[in-house]
């Protein structure tokens, strides 16, 4: 893509969650060597795939190299944008294990995700619950998927 090589494994993007809910996933779209190696053990790297510019999460603005509380406004905007576009599933990718763990700690473990939802209310007229949501963690790919209750 645009002169760079990427890995795309559409066979691993299972659209069914653990709860049985169907959702389209983009976990394995346009990955570099490091990203694909996190989950694909018996995998031969035939091309030098170092670029990340066309990675799904980077292209959609849902990639966080690092995470801290200052990112809550950005996250509220991401959620509001998804709701405005008729969706309710937000997939976030973090740039490292440390960033992922910090996001889980800040958002999930402390419950600040509900503060983000309340802040999202100010950014959209779409009705949704600020008291209930589902989330799925993928520590192998550093992903956090949010499912907003409408």
Where are each of the predicted segments found?
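Hydrophobic/aromatic-rich core segments of domains that either
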Residues: 1-32
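N-terminal accessory/pre-domain segments preceding catalytic cores
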Residues: 32-150
């Amino acid at each position: 893509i645009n002169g760079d090589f990427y890995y795309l494994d559409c066979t691993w993007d299972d659209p069914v969650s653990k709860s049985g809910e169907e959702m389209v996933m983009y976990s394995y779209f346009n990955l570099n060597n490091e990203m694909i190696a996190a989950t694909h053990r018996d995998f031969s790297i035939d091309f030098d795939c170092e670029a990340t510019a066309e990675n799904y999460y980077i292209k959609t603005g849902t990639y966080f190299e690092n995470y801290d509380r200052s990112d809550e406004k950005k996250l509220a905007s991401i959620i509001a944008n998804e709701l405005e576009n008729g969706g309710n599933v937000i997939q976030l990718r973090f740039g490292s294990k440390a960033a992922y763990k910090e996001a889980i700690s800040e958002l999930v473990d402390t419950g600040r995700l509900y503060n983000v939802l309340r802040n999202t209310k100010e950014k959209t007229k779409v009705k949704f619950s600020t008291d209930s949501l589902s989330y799925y963690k993928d520590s192998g790919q550093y992903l956090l998927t949010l499912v907003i209750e409408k």
